[in-house]
């Protein structure tokens, strides 16, 4: 079971191909973070496969997996986007776009045939991808006076947040990133250091 502050995604673009009754289904799984990125990839693949009969897709965004869409691109309703999304869901993936391009082979597949083909093509692309589990991280900025540097650095060493930025004058600043589930503890420890202030 995935923890609340982790999610599964893919590291790089991966492809899969499925053929059924001379129809060719080319699937591309792409890691994405925003709707804008999704639009760019869709534009690029629609241009690349301009001669294809259909370019269908599904995506999932956000570590909570609540932002998703499935598109049939002219195929009968529910026969393309939904089975693609089903493969994303069965692998518990997010921040992912899966596009399936169909070249019609002259023989109709029927509704159930299309569902099987789009599902199989999406499964091939996802199977070819490297799936990783990532943490949901949060950032915090703390300001403190230089004489209390050792206290701050001891906490950083023990709790192991990533140091994103730091500046050392009489007033020092440090921007840190740590996994969401550990943020409460880190914040509480930093706030106990004399002169330390959390900057929102």
Predicted regions and their residues:
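Short amphipathic alpha-helix segments
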Residues: 143-160
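Conserved short beta-strand edge segments in small beta-sheet-based binding/regulatory domains
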Residues: 162-168, 192-200
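C-terminal regulatory domains involved in ligand/effector binding and gene-expression control
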Residues: 1-78, 165, 192
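Structural motif
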Residues: 28, 55-57, 95-98, 139, ...
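Active-site beta-strand/loop microenvironment that shapes enzyme catalytic pockets
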Residues: 80-128
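Terminal, non-globular segments
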Residues: 176, 182-185
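Signal for well-folded cores of large energy- and translation-related assemblies
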Residues: 46, 88-89, 119, 123-130, ...
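Short glycine-/aliphatic-rich beta-strand segments at the starts of folded cytosolic domains
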Residues: 131-146, 174-176
């Amino acid at each position: 079971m995935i923890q609340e502050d982790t999610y599964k995604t893919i590291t790089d673009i991966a492809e899969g191909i499925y053929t059924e009754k001379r129809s060719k289904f080319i699937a591309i799984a792409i890691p994405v973070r925003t709707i804008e990125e999704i639009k760019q990839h869709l534009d690029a693949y629609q241009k690349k496969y301009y001669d294809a009969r259909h370019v269908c897709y599904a995506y999932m965004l956000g570590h909570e997996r609540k932002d998703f869409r499935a598109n049939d691109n002219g195929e009968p309703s529910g026969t393309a986007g939904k089975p693609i999304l089903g493969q994303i869901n069965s692998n518990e993936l997010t921040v992912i776009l899966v596009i399936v391009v169909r070249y019609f082979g002259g023989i109709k597949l029927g509704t159930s045939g299309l569902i099987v083909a789009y599902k199989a093509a999406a499964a091939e692309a996802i199977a070819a991808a490297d799936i990783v589990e990532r943490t949901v991280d949060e950032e915090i900025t703390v300001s403190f006076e230089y004489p209390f540097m050792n206290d701050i650095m001891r906490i950083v060493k023990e709790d192991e947040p990533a140091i994103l930025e730091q500046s050392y004058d009489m007033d020092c600043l440090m921007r840190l990133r740590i996994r969401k589930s550990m943020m409460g503890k880190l914040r509480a420890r930093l706030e106990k250091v004399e002169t330390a202030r959390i900057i929102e």
